[in-house]
């Protein structure tokens, strides 16, 4: 049965940037009051502050103020995941190719030609961390709990084919064929949606989990596990475990759906799941238990938790985060008109109760 939200929170944006309300793609609550939001049509982050059922005091923040993007003009990053751990905000782009859309005002011949055109936008291959202290971002700063520790913004190195992660994955027996064939994300190609960060108890490095919207292989979604270490402003893939692998690959039974977002809940992992292709269909929340005990590549069967409401062509759930009261906040891409205020500068997000 589809869940019913127990309340809603209105996200309010500056009028100059009110457009972001229609393309929200990621969310993370930090320090119990700051909501960090991603918009998949920009190279920015949005920050609002929660007070009751309102989240306002909007800040529109350019990622180029903290990171070195290949194209620093107006090219989108396609932010698809935001995570937080140990005073770092983590941001990931979709890492996907784009196929041109058909246009209503174009001829059949023009649209057929458009559907043959693929685009690689280099900014989409962003995987980065930015120091975060009391709701503010920094390129470099002292760790507030231990001033002798320096926090630095860092990112995975960009490459001609994307970045160092894509370079490694091109040799993967499951993912390599999709990457080498240049299959766009919305065609069940490689497409990142969701990131979760956990402090590593073994060596102090942060464990990063990355969700793939696609490809889904015979009904199995894929969850990548990485460890990253910083060398100045560069992030590098750390070899993990006795086998010294640069990533782990977990196959997750989400009933044929792909991963749309990730959110830590203690030692567990919440997974928002939805269609891989561009269609309106079931959106479900799953819970993967005891993430700490994942050591090797695995087949995983998480518990189904909620059915999230969706519309036909609107209200596409894209981001989830836990609120201080333990409830789940859900933000939507292409929100329905009943969610948006008359000035087109605010949008309603849903809050769902999670049963213990």
Indicate where each model-derived feature is located.
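Sequence/structural signature of beta-propeller domains
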Residues: 1-356
């Amino acid at each position: 049965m589809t869940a019913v939200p127990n309340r809603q929170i209105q996200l309010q944006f500056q009028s100059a940037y009110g457009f972001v309300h229609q393309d929200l793609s990621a969310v993370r609550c930090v320090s119990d009051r700051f909501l960090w939001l991603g918009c998949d049509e920009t190279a920015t982050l949005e920050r609002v502050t929660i007070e009751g059922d309102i989240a306002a005091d909007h800040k529109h923040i350019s990622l180029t103020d903290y990171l070195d993007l290949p194209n620093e003009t107006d090219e989108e990053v396609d932010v698809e995941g935001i995570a937080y751990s140990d005073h770092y905000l983590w941001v990931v782009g979709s890492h996907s190719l784009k196929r041109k859309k058909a246009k209503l005002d174009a001829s059949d011949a023009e649209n057929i030609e458009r559907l043959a055109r693929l685009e690689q936008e280099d900014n989409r291959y962003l995987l980065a961390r930015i120091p975060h202290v009391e709701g503010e971002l920094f390129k470099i700063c002292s760790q507030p709990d231990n001033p002798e520790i320096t926090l630095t913004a860092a990112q995975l190195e960009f490459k001609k084919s994307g970045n160092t992660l894509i370079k490694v994955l091109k040799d993967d027996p499951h993912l390599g064929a999709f990457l080498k064939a240049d299959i766009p994300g919305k065609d069940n190609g490689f497409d990142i949606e969701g990131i979760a960060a956990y402090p590593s108890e073994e060596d102090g490095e942060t464990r990063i989990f990355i969700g793939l919207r696609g490809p889904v292989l015979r009904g199995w979604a894929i969850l990548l596990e990485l460890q990253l270490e910083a060398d100045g402003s560069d992030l590098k893939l750390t070899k993990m475990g006795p086998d010294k692998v640069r990533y782990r690959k977990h196959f997750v039974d989400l009933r044929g759906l792909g991963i749309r977002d990730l959110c830590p809940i203690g030692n567990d992992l919440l997974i928002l799941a939805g269609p891989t292709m561009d269609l309106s269909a079931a959106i479900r929340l799953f819970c993967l238990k005891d993430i700490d005990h994942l050591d090797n590549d695995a087949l995983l069967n998480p518990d189904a938790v909620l059915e999230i409401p969706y519309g036909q062509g609107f209200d596409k759930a894209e981001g989830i985060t836990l609120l201080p009261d333990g409830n789940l906040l859900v933000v939507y891409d292409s929100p329905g008109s009943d969610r948006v205020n008359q000035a087109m500068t605010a949008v309603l997000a849903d809050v769902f109760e999670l049963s213990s």
